[in-house]
Amino acid sequence: LIVPRVLGLGSTLHLGAVAVKLGMLNPDDVDDEILADAADHLGAAQLAAAVPIVLAAVATAGFGLRRHEAEQATGKSQTANLIVAVAMNAASAGLLVASTDRQTPAAQRVTMPSLAASLATITAGISAQYATRPKGQALVIAASALMLPVNLLFSYVPVRAALKRSQSSKKRR
C-alpha cells in the first residue's frame, strides 16, 4: 500500500493497491488495453475534475480579496501563500488540459484528472481557510481528508467503466 515516491523523499499511497484491498478491482484486471480504453473515455472524469478546480479558483480569489485581513490576523505577509495557491490552481488546470493530449501515454492520462482534482481539493481548502479563518485548520483538515476519496474516485471510475465495456464486448462475441 505504501510505495517510495518517484520524486523526492518519503512514501506515497499506492491507489491501485488500495482499490484492490477495498475489493474495487482485482490485481490482474488492468492491462494496457483497459488503460487505453479508459483514456479514450475520460470526458466525464475531466468534466467532473473541473468542479474542484473551479472551486479552488473561487476560494483562491476569495483569499486574494481578503489577503490583508489574513495578514492582520496572522501578523505575517500572505503574498507567498497567495502565489502558491495561484500556482497550484494553474497546475491543476494544466494537468486537466494535459489529460486531453492523446500523445500522452494512456496510464498517465487516466491519472491526470484524479491528480488535478486532488490538488484542487487541497488548494480550495487551504485558500478557503486563509480567506475565512487564517489561524484555523478545520478546512485544511477537511480538504486533506477528501483528497484520498477524490483521488481514488477519479482514478477508479474510468478504469472500472473500461473494464465493464471490455466485459460486455467479450460477452457479445
List each model region and its residues.
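Short amphipathic, positively biased membrane-proximal segments
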Residues: 1-173
